[in-house]
Amino acid sequence: MSIIKEFREFAMRGNVVDLAVGVIIGAAFGKIVSSLVADIIMPPLGLLIGGIDFKQFAVTLREAQGDIPAVVMHYGVFIQNVFDFLIVAFAIFMAIKLINKLNRKKEEPAAATPAPTKEEVLLTEIRDLLKEQNNRS
């Protein structure tokens, strides 16, 4: 079997294709969440706490010297990324919770006990007759 044929069979398995679709959708969803945090959530939050832009929070570790740029730790961007993560994690949690709820509804209720077979009915009748005979004696 050629390597190309093996690779094609591997790539076309349902799991690999599903994973690829999930990664692509996840990347697009990440951009939406980043925009939500950066453009919708953080500006009002910054305004509420005094007109602060979180992206500008930074600590300069070393000033710029000539052609050498400054060494800056941008912890505001980190705070924003933490918000991104929390929103993505919450959205995934809610999606999984919804999927689990839908799957539980799809589960059929326990099947009713099957009707007794002819043999079971006959044996039950024999048992009942024997009980009656023992009670008469």
Swiss-Prot record:
InterPro entries given in the database record? Mechanosensitive_channel_CS, MS_channel, MSC/AndL, MscL_channel
Lineage top rank: taxon: Bacteria
Q: Which GO terms describe its molecular function?
A: mechanosensitive monoatomic ion channel activity
**Transmembrane regions listed in the UniProt entry:** 10-30, 76-96
Q: What Gene Ontology terms describe where this protein resides (cellular component)?
A: plasma membrane
Key words of the record = Cell inner membrane, Cell membrane, Ion channel, Ion transport, Membrane, Transmembrane, Transmembrane helix, Transport
Function of the protein: Channel that opens in response to stretch forces in the membrane lipid bilayer. May participate in the regulation of osmotic pressure changes within the cell.
Q: What is this protein called?
A: Large-conductance mechanosensitive channel
